[in-house]
Amino acid sequence: MIKTSNESIKFLVDSCINPDIDALKSQAVSVGKKRKEHTHNSKWFSTWDIRYNKIVDWGGEHGFESIKISRGNLWEAIGAYHRENKELFLVFKKPNLNKIIKYPFNGHYASIASVVNGDLPNIQTELFELNSTEEERIVEYEKMNEELIGKFDIKPERVILCGFSQFSFEAIIVNKWQQLAYTFDYSELIDHSYNEEPKEQPEIDPPKDSKKKNISKTKEPKPRIKGLKK
């Protein structure tokens, strides 16, 4: 069902799960985060920016075109569109994706975009049919999807939602009724040899001023990396 090769999907896996540690450390320095006593509230936003920008910068080498999706003034998401296969991938932390699937009629862009998947068969037995309000919401989604996709020069035939954690990467396809149609597990593509995202910000020494040579020679402890939702 998913035409895009595992090799290309592995790029998305690496972009999401294996962040650029050097970029994280540089961002921390830029906001003055040099010791554990300092705050770094922007870290989680920055981690997403690093993921998204990796897709923007290097996605073309793997067949992807980046699609910027604005969610008001507070958040910009990046979708990865494989133009040859006409597949649009949207990535989320797994808890966030679970929330999107659990509440499909809250107007999230992932739910709106998924109406292009049409009447795919539902793999789960539904206990309740859609009520009239939910059916009306789907009609609204179809109109909203035309506006959403119409902003870009793309014509996706499939929208694939990806959820990841530190040790897993899964892709799902829902039909236009927001029912689960397909699931795929790409966890085997995770390369655990990468540096893991630090759970705590490592201690970072401030940049040294080469002009100040007559300073104390007391050795500073070396910085340690302690390890690796929308």
Q: What are the functions of these language-model segments?
A:
Residues 1-46:
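Interdomain/boundary linker segments immediately adjacent to catalytic/signaling cores
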Residues 41, 59-88:
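A short acidic/basic microdomain associated with nuclease active sites
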Residues 44-48, 52, 87:
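Nuclease catalytic cores
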Residues 76-113, 117:
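Conserved catalytic cores of phosphodiester-cleaving nucleases, focusing on short active-site segments
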Residues 102-163:
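Catalytic cores of nucleic-acid endonucleases
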Residues 145-230:
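Glycine-rich, aromatic-bearing surface loops/beta-hairpins
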